[in-house]
Amino acid sequence: MDTPGSLQVIAIISLLLVGGASQPATFLEKALPTDGPSLETIEHKTEMVNTTRSEEQSPVRPSKTRQQLIDETPEICANAWVIRLITEFPTELGNMSQKQKTIAIQVHNTTMTMEETVFSLVSHVNKKNYEIHNVSGICTKYQLVPGNFTCSTRKCISQTKEKRIISTTVKDTYEVYLPFAWSQKPTGGDKYPEPQIGYNTGTGRLNQWNKDEFVIKQCRKKRGKRQITVPNSTLSPTGTTDFTKFTPNPISPNSTALNELEQKTTPIGTEQPFNNEKWQNLIFGNIVTKMDPQCEAELFQQFNISDKTVQVEFKVTSLPGQNISCQAIYNTEHGINIENKNCVISLIKENRKIKAHAYITRTGSYEWYAQQVTSKGIIQEVRNLVTIVECECPIVKPLPQGGIIPLTMPMRVLTNPSPILIHSALKFDLSKFGLSPCSFSPMEWQTYITKPLKRAMHGFEVHQRKKRDLGIGLHSTLNSWWNGANSLGLTVESADRQKYDQKILKVLQNLAVQQRTDVKNQQTLGKALETPIYTITLQLADSLTAAILKHEQQQNVGITCKDIAILTVTQIATYLRDIQHEHLPVWFIEQITNQILLPVGQVIMPEITAPPILNPLIGWNQSVLVIGLTHQLTITTVQQPLYKAANMGNFQDWTPFPPFILANKTHGFSIDCPIMRNSFLCHTLPTPVKLSEWERSTSTIYQTSPQVWITPEGKACLNHRNITVQDRTCLINKPGCFIPKHPWSAGKQTIVPTQYIQQNFVPDTIDTEDNQTRVLQKEMIEAISKAKRDYGVLKQGQIALIRHHEAITTILGQEATYSIKETQALISSIEQEAWYNNLFSWYDGSVWSQLQLIIVVITCTIPLLWVLNTCLFFKLRRAIRRERDNNIVVEYQAQTRGRRTHMTEPITKKQRAKLLRHAKTNRRLPRSLRATPAVSAFEMVTFDPQEETVEINRIDPSHENNDHGGPMNMAPIISADSYALPTPYITIMLDRELLNQGMRKVITLLNDPAREVFNKAYNLVTTNHFTLAYGCDESAGWVNQHAEYMGKPVIVTLAGLVITPVGLAWIPLPQQEPLEKLFMVPNSMPHVTVAMADYHETKEMGKIVKDINNEELLLVKPQLFKWGPEGFFVACPLVIRGVVTGHSLLHIACPATAVQAEGT
């Protein structure tokens, strides 16, 4: 440590608040670690001062008197204490081992019976640089608490939670100011104890510093309204901006909140219990991020605001002087005010979001600070440290001839688009409405269904001359929707039909292979479509349910089938008018590509030349409402990444100059393709031309028009005399080329760095703030697992549909047809062959069929057995007739529009078992169990809605929209009559979509150990809810006490997710009304079960959450905590709306005797 140098100290200070022993332990108070991070985490950043001294100079020692040092100590905190320490770094450091290289500056209270550390500044040693990492305070009688202060050029400005520590280092001598405050005043005649300061090298003993090396000073108490002085604003007409009204915590002087704020400057007593505000401080703990040095920085920060938000502030300050370079403040009372001086900042408010962008180009060190203040104080703080360095001026090399002007980054190119239709089905359980049987005449169907739907969907119709149907039959009629739910159908449209047929039939073959796999796994058709069906179902179900509830409320009469028809058509049509192509996310389309096994080099994307939804189909019977949707997508071929550019010079064979070209480093061609989802979508690509063949004579262009372009070697070339970066200009003596390392400006053009041009461009498929691809894929797998549990094994009719689809696909793959007529003729021949196959389907491998086969062979040579053969033939024919009547026989009738099909009686139990056994083993079916390859269909009256449908989710009519501006996915609102019979459950049903959004954030915060525990619970809970009461008697008692809450909305604030090997559960903030008041489940705590591990039940989760509350909570990384021996906790605050309901989760009610007993 003899080498002179500078020391940069970054201190992250955490002052731990622990309640006194006299009060009972509250929620999480027991779990609070005594040696971990505090509940009020404050982050400090030191101001570095570089000084040097000679090798011969002795360490700096205080030469002034103690009183002079006290007087010179700055007033950096109001109503608190400050320690000023000037000393050498301990010499024992050199003798310490690598594991012991930690030094603690400790403040001890010598007046106590036991010597306890009340303030420690822990620093870790890395070579010759000492970085202060953590400050914590622990004491039982006199506790250190954070003061409300800040320090700027040695001038105190009282501020809510912003703090600084000044550290000046000179070799191994340093000066540190440590602010602190006592948690309570001394009782009786006691005085404040004078702490002693020392260091601990890991040996366990305290080495004290000489008193001449430090002073302890009590700061004067300051009062008055707090304000911030900032540079003049460019927005004010007078040149100055009054920022006094934009305070970090703007409160009216006459309000009671001001008195509460002043009380916060007084140390908090140890007897104060753990409360919500401290819990939120844990959740929204400050995070300091140090960014890599760069030439220029573009900073971004976004906050979600609420009705309680008072002010949001963003600012960039230069270091070490803390001068404000630019600042933007949004205040709910005074609006937006922006100040730009040495950087540029912009502020955008969209709905409930505040977004800020700051652009810095001047060299130096800066702090990017953002905070949100609510009526309860600061709830969010973000700090980023960034250093701007000077960019190097380029050295140009001789300028070549020709080139192009780059306009975009390299982007993916997609060619040869061919349409593909993806079908999905949506079902509603109408039995929940208690409807009488519905019966429609053809005239009523036309009046209430066909005509309104046609008028509403007129803009989505496809021109018939361009439409070509391969005849797969999965999208022709409502019946096909009924049977082909969750299935995949294809329709082709192309000018070159023969060429396209050959390509698309290959896709159909691969689709058949995938469907065979689905049968083997006992999954429904179209496995890749289950998750998007679920998403679309939520949207349409909300619209449908909201319309029906609104109608019920207005009419106050029993709803009829015609009402459902009109409202359904109107709401769905209105919704589909505004739907956009982005309703299908890129990750979903990629999953479709993987599931149907597209050839290498082909992808699926939305169709930009047609509406995304075509011809919705709607139908219902007494118990089920079915909606069929057709999504139009495009299959394209992926080419290498190219970038769009403007032509400089011209190609030899092209006249006139093409205005735009697509090019890579070596070739280019003239075309102007539209951009969709960060890709160029081109119908065809011309033959590319080498860039080396550009016109050589370009001297005229050089003289008359300054240009910037890219050479075939990937260099940036220009004929400008100068280029600009940051706030300075680099002079260029002559035109030339160079390899850019940073963004540069030349005239109106920007030089793109070659490292960006030469690398492959990866389109941004997910939210730019956080890549959630892996999370969404996991959700898809979970949705598939849920579908398996809900639907179980396939019905016989669905298996027949798969076999038929496979047969037609295979035959069509062998013969490419040229027209619709030929395709229909081919399918008709297939149907005819199927009839013959059914006639000769007597051989199924049984003993009788084997015996008849032997007899047939023998009868060819032995005529004497003809009589026996005739007898057996008549016997087998009767068996065939019975077997055929019980088999899945489907008849096909060709019509001009669609197909009309029906299904005969179901097969026997014995045949059904044999059919399922063959489906599981993926073996070829016996002929006796094969269905005719016609379009299988269920009659609507035979459909069982209890097995394969989802019930309609209703919402509270008084709350039609949630915070996101759309209808909510709420629990069913039970009628008043249903409350007369109590159910075993009283719950708060929650919005699953919001919980899913929170889950996506949680997963990004997990480390490997937490993720391993997280993955153990994969059995999802179908309904997300708080259980308030359980049991018939308990539920009845709950209703008697809290009847006014039944059916009403409740706002709940979730604190985060508890992760245990048994299961996952959200837990709310403690002491939250009215949840604490309504919760009446013994031996449990309020929680929302999300998923459970195998061999565990949901009822276990309440005890698990209650038991883990007694464990310690240890910080792993920001927002992730170790809780208990195997559990974890992820802090993820989420405000969610629920509805209190007595709806039985298991669709059961309490016995009538319990109701009578309650009534008596």
From Swiss-Prot:
Extracellular side: 23-853, 1070-1127
Superkingdom, taxonomy of origin: Viruses
One GO term describing the cellular component: viral envelope
Keywords of this entry: Cleavage on pair of basic residues, Coiled coil, Fusion of virus membrane with host cell membrane, Fusion of virus membrane with host membrane, Glycoprotein, Host cell membrane, Host membrane, Host-virus interaction, Lipoprotein, Membrane, Signal, Transmembrane, Transmembrane helix, Viral attachment to host cell, Viral envelope protein, Viral penetration into host cytoplasm, Virion, Virus entry into host cell
GO terms (BP aspect): fusion of virus membrane with host plasma membrane; symbiont entry into host cell; virion attachment to host cell
First and last residue of the signal peptide: 1-22
PTM comment text: Specific enzymatic cleavages in vivo yield mature proteins. Envelope glycoproteins are synthesized as an inactive precursor that is N-glycosylated and processed likely by host cell furin or by a furin-like protease in the Golgi to yield the mature SU and TM proteins. The cleavage site between SU and TM requires the minimal sequence [KR]-X-[KR]-R.
Glycosylation sites: N50, N95, N109, N134, N148, N232, N254, N304, N323, N621, N664, N722, N771
Topology, Cytoplasmic side: 875-1048, 1149-1160
Ranges where the record places region Disordered: 230-251
Sequence intervals crossing the membrane: 854-874, 1049-1069, 1128-1148
Known partners and oligomeric status: The mature envelope protein (Env) consists of a trimer of SU-TM heterodimers attached by non-covalent interactions or by a labile interchain disulfide bond.
Descriptive protein name: Envelope glycoprotein
Organism this protein belongs to: Walleye dermal sarcoma virus
Organism taxonomic ancestry: Viruses, Riboviria, Pararnavirae, Artverviricota, Revtraviricetes
